[in-house]
Amino acid sequence: MTSTPKPLVLIILDGFGHSEVPEHNAIFAANTPVYDRLRATLPHGLISGSGMDVGLPDGQMGNSEVGHMNLGAGRVVYQDFTRVTKAIRDGEFFKNPVLTGAVDKAASAGKAVHILGLLSDGGVHSHQDHLVAMAELAAQRGAEKIYLHAFLDGRDTPPRSAQSSIELLDATFAKLGKGRIASLIGRYYAMDRDNRWDRVSAAYNLIVDSAAEYTADTAQAGLEAAYARDESDEFVKATRIGEAVKVEDGDAVVFMNFRADRARELSRAFVEPDFTEFARARLPKMAAYIGLTQYSAKIPAPAAFAPSSLNNVLGEYLAKNGKTQLRIAETEKYAHVTFFFSGGREEPFEGEERILIPSPKVATYDLQPEMNAPQVTDRIVEAIEQQRFDVIVVNYANGDMVGHTGVFEAAVKAVEALDTCVGRIVDALEKVGGEALITADHGNVEQMEDECTGQAHTAHTTEPVPFIYVGKRNLKVRDGGVLADVAPTMLQLLGLEKPVEMTGTSILVDA
């Protein structure tokens, strides 16, 4: 019999950062007796989940994909954002054979290049500098018809902040002497990830057939009209800009988001021959449909930047050592606790089980701030009591998903719901002698108002995240930890040597 405490639970509180500023801080405002008690009585500290510490540009806020990659890999994972930006700076982007091949096919036949993507400086799913570079590449290679179908952000950026991004792209096209913004739509429609196909169909029909609820002469005018209708960037309805632009046979389409999870549904509509999620009015015979990165191995679209493989991530190494593991989350974060935590692998490892709890079907999560966290917790408590698993990895989506709504009162309720859930897990572990690590992937809910603009702060933050050890061992939390140190910490608690690929080091040291 092993003497290792069982199970070891990694609790990832999504979007749950730490800020010393009490104003507009949903964690500070919430009643959190469990969290307060754990921090008062157990080894705890703060670790970094942003910038260079997670493989992003310095000062860039973290996000869920990046956070889970680093948590599961046990090493700093240099992100697609960083790879693409570097390629643009050193000129390799403009020689990328996937991108140049697609553009050349269309341009040589006098056809159009359509650029799709989130027009934003948020850096979470995309970056506007990448869209600028793609427009420049298309122009350099002789494309005369270059159209940007812009998805507006307002979620990883302030709710009404798209004007400067539109101005940047308008200026880019003016400088190039060709190309223009052809359509606007909020990311709520174009970048769904929860099978709300009515939203995706609005984006698809806008891009392919220029079918729009609204029209405007310029993108600036379209944005102003949306604001007059009280639509913030995220929720801007399908708007045609200028003369109708359709995706015709022989055109090339390039999707410039680098993050996969919110690019999959729209991409499927473009490339799956037997697509049935909604009735496509038309499926053009494109010269090429390209993703900036690989959105899924199952989506038949070449990637300009192919995934770099990660070996001996935590899940794989646990399987090699005969350990069992459970991954559990609700829909919104299921991909993060499985695909991203496993280093970009879709299939479970040997001895790995997965539980998906459907997210509630509400328009926005401020309407149900507890989401389905209680049901997630029911399944975790059950798994702890059964003692079938050596390791349980759970993601609670509330801090991030409710934080993104910008509704402070709802965010406070979300934090209080999390506190109750964590308390139930800690109680269940106490009964069986298990252990837990409580942390987060990035900040969000600790800052709910932008101190500069006074607008709701709906984006992630660069704040550090909590790290708490729940267990009986005489340990303390060292300073200077990062997300990549969490997997090595778990291996230490499990009594396993870390593999050579894991360059992170344990956050827990002898007290």
From Swiss-Prot:
Origin: domain of life: Bacteria
Cofactor(s) essential for the protein: Mn(2+)
Pfam families xrefs: iPGM_N (PF06415), Metalloenzyme (PF01676)
Catalysed reactions, as listed in the record: (2R)-2-phosphoglycerate = (2R)-3-phosphoglycerate
Binding site for Mn(2+) 2: 14, 64, 441-442
A Gene Ontology cellular-component term: cytosol
Record: residues binding Mn(2+) 1: 400, 404, 460
Active site location: 64
Family of this protein: Belongs to the BPG-independent phosphoglycerate mutase family.
The protein, known as: 2,3-bisphosphoglycerate-independent phosphoglycerate mutase
Native source organism of the sequence: Pseudomonas putida (strain GB-1)
